[in-house]
Regions:
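Phosphate-handling DNA/RNA-contact segment within nucleic-acid enzymes
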Residues: 1-58
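TOPRIM fold recognition
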Residues: 33-142
């Protein structure tokens, strides 16, 4: 699997020192049309091992900005792939800005920038929340 928009946005990503990872190519195009060349897309809400290697190799902060219908714990599972390797963040709409299937990129610049400003760092606390969720999920499957 490739990373859509990486070639076109590589220079801006290096200058800004961060990359925003979207699900849909449409989101990368939408942000680019708004003069924001920091976005790339992976075509789903699951990062492949190859995509992880490519993103880590950029040597910049990584921010996940998946659609609202992806749960916070599902986003945390993707963040876990970078835990302890890179500064990693995610956008989670706790304000009700997004509609059910909307991406942060679908919102006007002011709302997008607000959500980006209040991104959540995937740190030890977030890691523990994921482990707790996985444990509860495992209990339910027994």
């Amino acid at each position: 699997m490739n990373i859509y928009g990486l070639y076109e946005n590589y220079q801006t990503i290096q200058e800004k020192r961060y990359v925003v990872v979207f699900e849909s190519e449409k989101s990368t195009l939408k942000r680019y049309s708004r003069k924001d060349g920091t976005g790339v897309s992976i075509g789903s809400h699951t990062l492949s091992d190859e995509q992880v290697k490519i993103l880590v190799g950029l040597n910049v902060d990584i921010i996940i900005a998946f659609d609202k219908d992806v749960s916070q714990n599902e986003v945390r599972k993707e963040c876990e792939k970078f835990y302890g390797i890179r500064n990693f963040y995610y956008i989670y709409d706790k304000w009700g800005i997004l509609d059910k299937k909307e991406s942060p990129a679908d919102r006007p610049n002011k709302q997008y920038e607000f959500m980006l400003k209040y991104k959540i760092k995937y740190d030890e606390t977030e890691h523990k929340e994921l482990l707790k969720w996985l444990k509860e999920k495992q209990k339910q499957n027994i």
